[in-house]
Protein backbone atom coordinates (compact mmCIF):
# COMPACT_ATOMS: atom_id res chain seq x y z
CA UNK A 1 0.00 0.00 0.00
CA UNK A 2 1.63 3.19 -1.16
CA UNK A 3 1.91 6.02 1.35
CA UNK A 4 -0.45 8.92 1.08
CA UNK A 5 1.05 12.08 -0.35
CA UNK A 6 1.59 14.79 2.22
CA UNK A 7 -1.25 17.22 2.61
CA UNK A 8 -0.66 20.64 1.20
CA UNK A 9 -2.16 23.65 2.87
CA UNK A 10 -3.60 26.32 0.64
CA UNK A 11 -3.29 29.76 2.12
CA UNK A 12 -6.63 31.49 1.65
CA UNK A 13 -7.29 35.18 1.87
CA UNK A 14 -10.46 35.54 3.97
CA UNK A 15 -11.27 38.71 2.05
CA UNK A 16 -10.87 37.03 -1.33
CA UNK A 17 -11.80 33.36 -0.98
CA UNK A 18 -12.75 33.07 -4.65
CA UNK A 19 -9.42 34.47 -5.84
CA UNK A 20 -11.04 37.39 -7.65
CA UNK A 21 -7.93 39.55 -7.34
CA UNK A 22 -5.99 37.25 -9.65
CA UNK A 23 -8.58 37.85 -12.37
CA UNK A 24 -8.39 41.64 -12.26
CA UNK A 25 -6.25 43.79 -14.49
CA UNK A 26 -3.98 46.49 -13.13
CA UNK A 27 -6.42 49.13 -14.38
CA UNK A 28 -9.35 47.48 -12.61
CA UNK A 29 -7.38 47.27 -9.37
CA UNK A 30 -6.55 50.96 -9.74
CA UNK A 31 -10.24 51.82 -10.05
CA UNK A 32 -11.00 49.81 -6.92
CA UNK A 33 -8.16 51.46 -5.00
CA UNK A 34 -9.32 54.95 -5.98
CA UNK A 35 -12.88 54.27 -4.82
CA UNK A 36 -11.63 52.65 -1.61
CA UNK A 37 -9.55 55.75 -0.90
CA UNK A 38 -12.45 58.16 -1.32
CA UNK A 39 -14.61 55.93 0.87
CA UNK A 40 -11.94 55.97 3.59
CA UNK A 41 -11.57 59.75 3.50
CA UNK A 42 -15.04 61.07 2.72
CA UNK A 43 -17.55 58.40 3.79
CA UNK A 44 -16.27 56.03 6.49
CA UNK A 45 -15.49 58.71 9.12
CA UNK A 46 -19.04 60.08 8.93
CA UNK A 47 -21.31 57.20 7.96
CA UNK A 48 -22.13 56.13 11.54
CA UNK A 49 -23.36 59.65 12.27
CA UNK A 50 -25.39 59.69 9.05
CA UNK A 51 -26.94 56.35 9.96
CA UNK A 52 -27.85 57.54 13.45
CA UNK A 53 -29.39 60.77 12.18
CA UNK A 54 -31.13 59.08 9.26
CA UNK A 55 -29.90 61.84 6.98
CA UNK A 56 -27.20 62.52 4.41
CA UNK A 57 -26.04 66.09 4.94
CA UNK A 58 -23.74 67.46 2.30
CA UNK A 59 -25.12 65.07 -0.30
CA UNK A 60 -24.43 67.57 -3.09
CA UNK A 61 -20.79 67.97 -2.12
CA UNK A 62 -20.44 64.20 -1.92
CA UNK A 63 -22.07 63.79 -5.34
CA UNK A 64 -19.59 66.27 -6.84
CA UNK A 65 -16.67 64.41 -5.28
CA UNK A 66 -17.95 61.12 -6.68
CA UNK A 67 -18.46 62.85 -10.02
CA UNK A 68 -14.85 64.04 -10.11
CA UNK A 69 -13.81 60.42 -9.71
CA UNK A 70 -15.97 59.48 -12.70
CA UNK A 71 -18.35 57.27 -10.70
CA UNK A 72 -21.64 58.80 -11.85
CA UNK A 73 -22.85 57.08 -14.99
CA UNK A 74 -19.38 55.56 -15.17
CA UNK A 75 -20.46 52.73 -17.51
CA UNK A 76 -22.10 55.05 -20.05
CA UNK A 77 -20.39 56.44 -23.16
CA UNK A 78 -20.22 60.11 -24.09
CA UNK A 79 -21.75 63.23 -22.55
CA UNK A 80 -18.95 63.47 -20.00
CA UNK A 81 -19.41 59.91 -18.72
CA UNK A 82 -16.35 57.78 -18.02
CA UNK A 83 -17.26 54.90 -20.35
CA UNK A 84 -15.76 52.27 -18.04
CA UNK A 85 -16.47 48.55 -18.10
CA UNK A 86 -19.08 46.59 -16.18
CA UNK A 87 -16.27 45.11 -14.08
CA UNK A 88 -15.05 48.61 -13.15
CA UNK A 89 -18.59 49.58 -12.22
CA UNK A 90 -19.09 46.43 -10.17
CA UNK A 91 -15.85 46.97 -8.26
CA UNK A 92 -16.79 50.57 -7.52
CA UNK A 93 -20.20 49.54 -6.22
CA UNK A 94 -18.66 46.84 -4.03
CA UNK A 95 -16.38 49.40 -2.39
CA UNK A 96 -19.24 51.85 -1.87
CA UNK A 97 -21.43 49.08 -0.49
CA UNK A 98 -18.69 48.16 1.98
CA UNK A 99 -18.92 51.69 3.37
CA UNK A 100 -22.71 51.97 3.28
CA UNK A 101 -25.48 50.69 1.04
CA UNK A 102 -27.12 54.10 1.04
CA UNK A 103 -24.09 55.68 -0.63
CA UNK A 104 -23.98 52.91 -3.21
CA UNK A 105 -27.68 53.60 -3.82
CA UNK A 106 -26.94 57.27 -4.49
CA UNK A 107 -24.45 56.27 -7.19
CA UNK A 108 -26.35 53.40 -8.78
CA UNK A 109 -29.70 55.21 -8.93
CA UNK A 110 -28.02 58.26 -10.43
CA UNK A 111 -26.11 56.28 -13.05
CA UNK A 112 -28.05 53.11 -13.82
CA UNK A 113 -31.60 54.44 -13.49
CA UNK A 114 -31.88 58.21 -13.95
CA UNK A 115 -28.92 58.73 -16.28
CA UNK A 116 -29.34 55.45 -18.15
CA UNK A 117 -33.01 56.19 -18.83
CA UNK A 118 -32.09 59.51 -20.46
CA UNK A 119 -29.04 58.02 -22.21
CA UNK A 120 -31.01 55.09 -23.64
CA UNK A 121 -34.43 56.62 -24.33
CA UNK A 122 -33.96 60.39 -24.40
CA UNK A 123 -33.74 62.80 -27.29
CA UNK A 124 -30.38 64.35 -28.20
CA UNK A 125 -31.56 67.56 -26.52
CA UNK A 126 -32.53 65.78 -23.30
CA UNK A 127 -29.20 63.98 -23.21
CA UNK A 128 -27.20 67.15 -23.80
CA UNK A 129 -29.12 69.12 -21.19
CA UNK A 130 -28.91 66.60 -18.36
CA UNK A 131 -26.20 63.99 -18.77
CA UNK A 132 -23.08 66.23 -18.55
CA UNK A 133 -24.11 67.91 -15.26
CA UNK A 134 -25.32 64.58 -13.86
CA UNK A 135 -21.96 62.99 -14.68
CA UNK A 136 -20.13 65.65 -12.66
CA UNK A 137 -22.58 65.60 -9.77
CA UNK A 138 -23.67 69.17 -10.43
CA UNK A 139 -27.17 67.77 -11.02
CA UNK A 140 -28.78 64.88 -9.16
CA UNK A 141 -31.45 62.65 -10.65
CA UNK A 142 -34.09 60.25 -9.40
CA UNK A 143 -36.22 57.53 -10.99
CA UNK A 144 -39.96 57.60 -10.35
CA UNK A 145 -41.51 54.19 -10.95
CA UNK A 146 -42.56 52.66 -7.60
CA UNK A 147 -45.92 53.79 -6.20
CA UNK A 148 -47.53 53.52 -2.74
CA UNK A 149 -50.03 50.87 -3.90
CA UNK A 150 -48.17 49.31 -6.82
CA UNK A 151 -44.54 48.93 -5.81
CA UNK A 152 -44.13 45.53 -7.44
CA UNK A 153 -46.88 45.92 -10.05
CA UNK A 154 -45.87 48.83 -12.29
CA UNK A 155 -48.28 47.76 -15.03
CA UNK A 156 -51.10 49.02 -12.80
CA UNK A 157 -49.51 52.31 -11.79
CA UNK A 158 -51.96 55.11 -11.07
CA UNK A 159 -49.81 58.06 -12.13
CA UNK A 160 -51.41 59.47 -15.27
CA UNK A 161 -50.25 61.74 -18.07
CA UNK A 162 -52.72 63.29 -20.49
CA UNK A 163 -52.51 65.74 -23.34
CA UNK A 164 -53.85 69.22 -22.69
CA UNK A 165 -55.11 70.02 -26.15
CA UNK A 166 -55.22 68.50 -29.59
CA UNK A 167 -52.34 67.30 -31.70
CA UNK A 168 -49.01 65.63 -31.07
CA UNK A 169 -47.34 68.79 -29.81
CA UNK A 170 -49.77 69.60 -27.00
CA UNK A 171 -48.49 69.88 -23.43
CA UNK A 172 -48.69 66.97 -21.02
CA UNK A 173 -50.33 67.15 -17.57
CA UNK A 174 -49.07 64.67 -14.96
CA UNK A 175 -50.88 63.65 -11.78
CA UNK A 176 -49.95 60.96 -9.29
CA UNK A 177 -47.37 59.97 -6.69
CA UNK A 178 -44.27 57.83 -6.38
CA UNK A 179 -42.89 56.23 -3.21
CA UNK A 180 -39.49 55.09 -1.86
CA UNK A 181 -37.62 57.18 -4.43
CA UNK A 182 -33.87 57.41 -3.81
CA UNK A 183 -32.48 60.96 -4.21
CA UNK A 184 -36.02 62.34 -4.58
CA UNK A 185 -35.79 65.28 -2.17
CA UNK A 186 -32.44 66.48 -3.51
CA UNK A 187 -32.96 65.74 -7.20
CA UNK A 188 -32.78 68.38 -9.91
CA UNK A 189 -34.47 66.12 -12.43
CA UNK A 190 -36.85 63.19 -12.11
CA UNK A 191 -37.50 60.47 -14.67
CA UNK A 192 -41.23 59.81 -14.19
CA UNK A 193 -43.14 56.88 -15.66
CA UNK A 194 -46.87 57.40 -16.16
CA UNK A 195 -49.88 55.80 -17.81
CA UNK A 196 -51.07 57.45 -21.03
CA UNK A 197 -53.58 56.55 -23.73
CA UNK A 198 -50.68 54.94 -25.60
CA UNK A 199 -49.41 52.93 -22.64
CA UNK A 200 -46.67 53.73 -20.15
CA UNK A 201 -44.44 56.64 -21.17
CA UNK A 202 -41.37 58.20 -19.60
CA UNK A 203 -40.98 61.92 -18.88
CA UNK A 204 -38.00 64.09 -17.96
CA UNK A 205 -39.30 66.35 -15.19
CA UNK A 206 -37.21 69.23 -13.78
CA UNK A 207 -38.03 69.22 -10.09
CA UNK A 208 -38.61 72.97 -9.99
CA UNK A 209 -41.64 72.51 -12.27
CA UNK A 210 -44.81 73.88 -10.59
CA UNK A 211 -46.87 71.06 -9.11
CA UNK A 212 -43.89 68.81 -8.38
CA UNK A 213 -43.00 68.24 -4.73
CA UNK A 214 -40.94 65.75 -2.73
CA UNK A 215 -41.27 64.68 0.90
CA UNK A 216 -38.36 63.11 2.77
CA UNK A 217 -39.21 59.72 4.29
CA UNK A 218 -37.85 59.46 7.84
CA UNK A 219 -37.53 56.75 10.51
CA UNK A 220 -36.37 54.05 8.10
CA UNK A 221 -35.02 50.75 9.39
CA UNK A 222 -32.36 50.50 6.68
CA UNK A 223 -30.63 52.62 4.03
CA UNK A 224 -30.67 55.38 6.62
CA UNK A 225 -27.71 57.22 5.08
CA UNK A 226 -29.74 57.69 1.91
CA UNK A 227 -32.24 60.30 0.77
CA UNK A 228 -35.51 58.41 0.25
CA UNK A 229 -38.63 60.33 -0.69
CA UNK A 230 -42.23 60.42 -1.79
CA UNK A 231 -42.84 62.35 -5.01
CA UNK A 232 -46.14 64.10 -5.68
CA UNK A 233 -47.19 65.33 -9.12
CA UNK A 234 -50.16 67.66 -8.86
CA UNK A 235 -51.07 69.00 -12.27
CA UNK A 236 -47.44 69.11 -13.46
CA UNK A 237 -47.44 70.71 -16.91
CA UNK A 238 -44.69 69.63 -19.28
CA UNK A 239 -43.96 70.56 -22.89
CA UNK A 240 -44.16 67.80 -25.47
CA UNK A 241 -40.37 67.63 -25.69
CA UNK A 242 -40.22 66.34 -22.08
CA UNK A 243 -41.44 62.86 -23.10
CA UNK A 244 -39.19 60.02 -24.25
CA UNK A 245 -40.28 59.93 -27.89
CA UNK A 246 -39.96 56.29 -28.91
CA UNK A 247 -40.32 53.95 -25.96
CA UNK A 248 -43.79 52.82 -24.86
CA UNK A 249 -44.94 50.21 -22.38
CA UNK A 250 -43.12 48.43 -19.59
CA UNK A 251 -40.09 47.82 -21.79
CA UNK A 252 -38.99 51.39 -20.94
CA UNK A 253 -38.77 51.20 -17.15
CA UNK A 254 -37.89 47.50 -17.10
CA UNK A 255 -34.92 48.08 -19.42
CA UNK A 256 -33.61 50.54 -16.84
CA UNK A 257 -34.16 48.10 -13.97
CA UNK A 258 -32.32 45.39 -15.91
CA UNK A 259 -29.42 47.79 -16.42
CA UNK A 260 -29.32 48.67 -12.74
CA UNK A 261 -29.34 45.10 -11.54
Where are these regions (language model features)?
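Glycine-rich phosphate/pyrophosphate-binding beta-alpha loops
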Residues: 151, 179-185, 259-261
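Active-site-adjacent elements of ketosynthase-type condensing enzymes
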Residues: 149-158
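Amphipathic, small/basic residue-rich leader segments at the start of a protein or domain
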Residues: 1-106, 126-129, 133-136, 167
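Glycine-rich beta->alpha junctions and the first turn(s) of the following alpha-helix
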Residues: 20-24, 31, 213-261
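A short, Trp-centered hydrophobic/proline-enriched beta-strand micro-motif
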Residues: 137-145
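A structural signal for short hydrophobic beta-strand segments in well-ordered beta-sheet cores
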Residues: 159-163
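N-terminal glycine-rich flavin-associated loop
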Residues: 105-125, 151
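A short core secondary-structure module
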Residues: 170-171, 175-215
Amino acid sequence: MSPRPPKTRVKLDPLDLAGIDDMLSAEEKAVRAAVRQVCASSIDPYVAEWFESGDLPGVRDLAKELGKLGLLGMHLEGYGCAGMSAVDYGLACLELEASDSGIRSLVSVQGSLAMFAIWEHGTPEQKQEWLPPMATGEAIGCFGLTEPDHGSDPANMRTKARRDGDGDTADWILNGSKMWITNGSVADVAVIWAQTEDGIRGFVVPTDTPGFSARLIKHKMSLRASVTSELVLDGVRLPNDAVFPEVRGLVGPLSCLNEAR
